């Protein structure tokens, strides 16, 4: 780079791109090029860049005029770029010493136990920028873009880094406690790990002041399996342990009550043994120690151990623990007394506020509840379960809570993206052409991208997208194909060629199904998209809408990847009509090249706003139709009334005429007699 006409630009915002830098400096004068230095791994910019002007005067003017100007909300720092000078007389030893000193002094922090919501440096920067300037943030990922759960933060100076570490260590980000520490080199980390591994067996157990064996926390617990647990339900909270403390739930073998055994605990993991004498305790004070827990539960009988459940990242208590009794009868007695504790469902008003973890002050000290009071908290005691049972209960209760709260429900039906996908192990995969494989893979990628970008889009439960159809297929023939798909699927099921729709799939849209049409069919609509210009030529794709998800799923699984021709559709329809002795439909003659096409069938992507407008339009149309029908009925009634009135008048006139004739005849008779 030409140092005379090149500016070194610092303090760039993370979202600043090369074009933004070019546009910002081009107002001063012509620019040869502008570069934003990025991280080759993540693609995020490092917060600095270079701008090279065509003229030296423009570079000097830019350094003066744009100094302390803001770009994307950050004040730029401008200097003339100079080549990096390297000393050629440095020996290898001096370089190694300088590198060590530089690494030891650079203010880099490691943040562990990050929540999965922290995916980009911008998400983490606000937490550290209040302590000083953040130079760089790296968030490593695994294969497939999965997060590793930790990150590195490089602060401008060591004082700011130290202040950030002291302030943020142990705090929560998105409900998850983080651990902040100085970052060390990989070699130093591996050396420390080996040293810790060699002394692990020696530190695996220790003895309390009273001689009772206390089991240490298993540091190998997986922090990724933690789940937040609501404190209202017994069964739900028990499941909160998940796999994190799976080894803690297991049996710790007790070889007797001799004094020599108090200093030795066999920490073998046995999933299905020894849980009859173990209880699980919740609602503990975070500051509660294992010794305090041990001393409190000794009132129920001799104990083997008392153990707290700790966060492996911060080594802090999670407010839960395990108590193992020496005798099963003492454990059962404790559980029986715990079952007598008062349980009261919160009122609707109480649900609006956080539940109190403290017991009422007016509690009777002689009651059962007083035996489960520790640090002013009423403990919740239940039976301990194995890791597998805890995981099953946790998953079940988590789903129940999410459904009650309206969370975790796939309202956009994204799981339907996999329907219609022909994987490499599918029987049809080898029969697909390379073009067909490419089209399908591109379609999946495009659909995923659309759904990620626009949250108003969702996958329809009963509407299918049919692509790669012949341009000679009109809505009438497409409707025939839809009906044939349902019949074909049911025939395959009866012959044992394919599995039927499951009960869960059948009830997926329960309460949201469409009404059958006048014909009583399951196909609600068949539509072929046509070009607006010209004679309305088909675009080669269309849509089918069924009355329920069940029939849409049947049609998709039968049609997807199937080769069809217009002749096959027409012949199948004629055969069906003859078999069931119904009039054959009037079908067009095939006088064109009817080559086979393999269908691509997927659940259609719909916009919730468009769907709402369509529903409102249909509702308005139905209301208008109803009003027109009512008006027509009223008009018919009026017409009938008027017609009946005319008929009544005619009848009355006729009767009057007859009466007059009779009266005249009577008058004539009387006149003759006289």
Curated annotation (Swiss-Prot):
Residues 194-270, 621-674 are annotated as: Disordered. It is found in: Nucleus, Nucleolus. Residues 5-83, 107-185, 277-386, 486-579 form the RRM domain. Keywords: Nucleus, Phosphoprotein, Repeat, RNA-binding. The keyword Signal does not apply. One of its GO terms (biological process) is rRNA processing. CDD domains: RRM1_Nop4p, RRM2_Nop4p, RRM3_Nop4p, RRM4_Nop4p. One of its GO terms (cellular component) is nucleolus. InterPro entries: Nop4_RRM1, Nop4_RRM2, Nop4_RRM4, Nop4p_RRM3, Nucleotide-bd_a/b_plait_sf, RBD_domain_sf, RRM_dom, RRM_dom_euk. Residues 230-239 have a biased composition (Basic and acidic residues). Residues 662-674 have a biased composition (Basic residues). Residues 219-229, 240-256 have a biased composition (Acidic residues). It holds the Pfam family RRM_1. The modification Phosphoserine is found at residues 223, 225, 242, 247. Gene3D superfamilies: 3.30.70.330. GO terms for molecular function: mRNA binding. PANTHER family: RNA-BINDING MOTIF PROTEIN 14B, RNA-BINDING PROTEIN 28. This is Uncharacterized RNA-binding protein C4F6.14.
């Amino acid at each position: 780079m030409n140092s005379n006409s090149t500016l070194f630009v610092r303090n760039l915002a993370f979202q600043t791109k090369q074009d933004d830098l070019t546009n910002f400096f081009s107002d001063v004068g012509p620019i040869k090029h502008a570069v934003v230095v990025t991280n080759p791994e993540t693609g995020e910019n490092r917060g600095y860049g270079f701008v090279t002007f065509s003229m030296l005067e423009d570079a000097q003017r830019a350094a003066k005029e744009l100094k302390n100007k803001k770009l994307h909300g950050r004040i730029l720092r401008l200097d003339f770029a100079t080549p990096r000078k390297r000393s050629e007389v440095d020996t290898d030893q001096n370089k190694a010493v300088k590198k060590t000193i530089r690494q030891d002094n650079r203010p880099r922090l490691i943040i562990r136990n990050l929540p999965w919501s922290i995916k980009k440096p911008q998400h983490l920067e606000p937490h550290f920028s209040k302590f000083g300037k953040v130079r760089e943030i790296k968030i490593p990922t695994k294969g497939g873009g999965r997060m590793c759960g930790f990150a590195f933060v490089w602060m401008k100076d060591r004082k700011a880094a130290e202040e950030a570490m002291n302030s943020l260590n142990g705090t929560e980000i998105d409900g998850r406690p983080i651990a902040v520490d100085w970052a060390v080199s990989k070699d130093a980390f591996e050396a420390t790990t080996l040293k810790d591994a060699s002394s692990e067996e020696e530190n695996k157990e220790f003895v309390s002041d009273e001689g009772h064996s206390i089991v240490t926390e298993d540091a190998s617990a997986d922090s990724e399996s933690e789940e937040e647990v609501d404190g209202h339900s017994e069964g739900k909270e028990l499941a909160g342990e998940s796999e994190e403390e799976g080894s803690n739930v297991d049996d710790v073998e007790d070889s007797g009550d001799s004094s020599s055994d108090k200093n030795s605990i066999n920490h073998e993991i046995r999933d299905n043994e020894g849980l009859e004498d173990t209880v699980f305790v919740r609602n503990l004070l975070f500051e509660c120690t294992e010794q305090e827990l041990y001393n409190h539960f000794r009132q129920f009988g001799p104990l083997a151990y008392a153990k707290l459940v700790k966060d492996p990242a911060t080594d802090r208590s999670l407010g839960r623990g395990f108590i193992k009794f020496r005798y099963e009868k003492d454990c059962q007695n404790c559980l029986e007394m715990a079952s007598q504790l008062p349980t009261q469902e919160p009122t609707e008003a109480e649900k609006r506020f956080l539940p109190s973890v403290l017991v009422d002050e007016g509690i009777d000290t002689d009651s059962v509840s007083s035996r489960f009071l520790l640090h002013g908290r009423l403990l919740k005691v239940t039976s301990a379960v194995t890791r597998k049972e805890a995981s099953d209960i946790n998953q079940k209760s988590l789903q129940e809570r999410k459904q009650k709260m309206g969370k975790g429900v796939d309202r956009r039906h994204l799981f339907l993206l996999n329907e219609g996908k022909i994987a490499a192990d599918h029987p049809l995969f080898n029969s697909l052409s390379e073009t067909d494989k490419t089209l399908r893979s591109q379609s999946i990628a495009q659909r995923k991208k659309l759904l990620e970008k626009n949250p108003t889009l969702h996958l329809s439960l009963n509407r299918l997208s049919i692509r790669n159809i012949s341009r000679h297929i009109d809505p009438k023939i497409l409707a025939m194909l839809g009906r044939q798909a349902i019949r074909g699927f049911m025939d395959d099921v009866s012959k044992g060629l394919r599995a039927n729709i499951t009960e869960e799939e059948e009830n997926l849209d329960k309460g949201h199904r469409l009404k059958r049409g006048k014909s009583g069919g399951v196909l609600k609509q068949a539509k072929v998209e046509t070009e607006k210009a010209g004679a309305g030529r088909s675009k080669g794709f269309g849509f089918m809408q069924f009355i329920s998800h069940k029939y849409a799923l049947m049609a998709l699984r039968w049609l997807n990847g199937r080769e069809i021709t217009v002749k096959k559709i027409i012949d199948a329809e004629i055969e069906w009509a003859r078999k069931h002795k119904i009039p054959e439909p009037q079908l067009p003659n095939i006088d064109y090249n009817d080559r086979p096409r393999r269908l691509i069938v997927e659940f259609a992507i719909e916009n919730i706003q468009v769907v709402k407008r369509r529903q409102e339009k249909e509702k308005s149309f139905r209301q208008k139709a109803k009003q027109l029908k009512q008006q027509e009925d009223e008009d018919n009634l009026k017409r009938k009334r008027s017609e009946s009135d005319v008929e009544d008048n005619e009848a009355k006139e006729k009767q009057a005429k007859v009466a007059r004739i009779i009266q005249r005849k009577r008058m004539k008779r009387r006149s003759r007699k006289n």
